[in-house]
Design a protein with these regions (language model features):
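Terminal, low-structured helical/coil segments at or just beyond the last alpha-helical repeat
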Residues: 253, 312-359
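Surface-exposed polar/charged interaction patches
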Residues: 207, 274, 290, 305-309, ...
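Internal/C-terminal transmembrane anchor helices
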Residues: 40-69
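Membrane-embedded alpha-helical segments of integral membrane proteins
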Residues: 1-35
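Intrinsically disordered, low-complexity segments enriched in Gly and acidic/Ser/Thr residues
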Residues: 276-322
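Short, compositionally biased small/polar motifs
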Residues: 247, 251-252
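Soluble catalytic regions of membrane-associated enzymes that act on cell-envelope
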Residues: 64-239, 243, 254-274
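Extended alpha-helical scaffold regions
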Residues: 28-41, 45-48, 159-160, 188, ...
């Protein structure tokens, strides 16, 4: 389930079951041509054929029905969608309440929101507690390393992709996995290291399920050899492995690539999670303001909080009147927090205001 589509696996299993049934039917028809006298109940067809099938069916049902197995299946399915960049499927599968209970699902959901451009609109519904919700700075686990490879790939840092893929491979049982190999092949093709990519393709071709995928990658290599060598345009260092924080790393990326909206959104949302509103307002004015026709939801919410201390900020940024009315209602309820605590969470639990004042 980790490396292949579940639907394809089910079709293979169903095909083998059908072959087994055909063999049984053929042997049963041949037996009927010869009279066989059954003298003992142990030789009954029920015990010889139906009972084993029933036992296998019950065993499979009990295995599939176990909660921990369903959780593993969901994790593998989500990782498969992340690798294929099926962001909408990821968000449809991960509910906000699930993300609050599972850090891995929370990371996946926030990455998917970033990719569809809605991180600054819906982030707080998924319960982030800090910038650690964006990236695993201290990797501990195979799927966390897989997440980091996807994170680097989404930011366009293929050097980071290769490093994390090797880290993931070392945590597998055999020192390498199909997932890591596929990641290394794609990253090296983008980097222009076609010889290295071909080496990994030779390893992967010995598997049973990657023939068509390998052909597609070899076609990319052939096409690339006819074009000018392409090198990834970003070389982001190993995030959060030294003394620098996630926000500082994103600030460095934005400084080098001011047109990178994904890194800019991560920077702004990271400042919101750190509750550093003065720097948020500065970065928004210096970098992001010229890119936006309208302010995203969480940016408006943050600016209204800044405006309480620095009213002149609201003269620079235009905030929707409806949002201003919502903030006034929230703040009036906040003054009576003990009385309206449950209403604050139910009405504003997915807002920056609730995160800033109540967590």
């Amino acid at each position: 389930f980790q490396d292949e589509d579940l639907e394809r696996s089910v079709w293979w299993c169903s095909g083998f079951i059908l072959v087994a049934l055909l063999v049984y039917a053929f042997s049963y028809v041949r037996k009927r041509r010869t009279k066989v006298e059954v003298k003992h109940w142990l030789a009954s067809p029920f015990l010889n054929y139906l009972f084993p099938c029933l036992a296998v069916g019950i065993s499979v049902f009990l295995l599939i029905g176990r909660e921990e197995h369903q959780e593993v299946e969901k994790i593998c399915r989500l990782d498969h969608w992340i690798e294929d960049k099926e962001w909408e499927k990821v968000l449809q599968s991960i509910r906000p309440e699930d993300a609050k209970q599972s850090l891995l699902q929370q990371h996946w959901a926030l990455l998917a929101l970033s990719q569809i451009g809605e991180l600054s609109e819906r982030m707080f519904a998924y319960g982030p507690t800090g910038t650690d919700s964006f990236f695993y700075s201290m990797e501990d686990g195979l799927f966390r390393e897989y997440f980091n490879t996807s994170f680097y790939e989404c930011l366009g840092s293929d050097n980071g992709v290769v490093h994390s893929a090797f880290q993931a491979a070392t945590q597998t049982r055999y020192g390498m996995s199909f997932r890591a190999l596929r990641t290394l092949i794609k990253a090296n093709i983008r980097l222009g290291n076609t010889e290295v990519a071909e080496k990994y393709l030779v390893l992967l071709q010995h598997s049973t399920c990657h023939a068509r995928w390998g052909e597609a990658q070899r076609k990319k290599i052939a096409d690339q050899s006819r074009l000018e060598k392409h090198v990834s345009n970003k070389s982001i260092g190993r995030l959060l492995q030294g003394s620098r924080s996630f926000v500082v790393e994103m600030a460095a990326v934005v400084d080098h690539y001011p047109e990178d909206r994904k890194a800019l959104e991560y920077l702004l949302c990271g400042l919101l999670l750190q509750k550093d509103l003065d720097k948020f307002a500065y970065v928004l004015h210096e970098y992001a303001f010229r890119f936006m026709n309208r302010l995203p939801r969480h940016y408006e919410e943050a600016l209204l909080v800044v405006g309480m201390k620095h009213p002149e900020v609201l003269e620079v940024f235009s905030v929707d009147k409806t949002k201003i009315e919502q903030f006034e209602r929230f703040y009036s309820m906040l003054q009576k927090r003990d009385e309206y605590k449950w209403m604050l969470e139910s009405q504003f639990g997915d807002s920056f205001w609730f995160y800033y004042y109540c967590t």
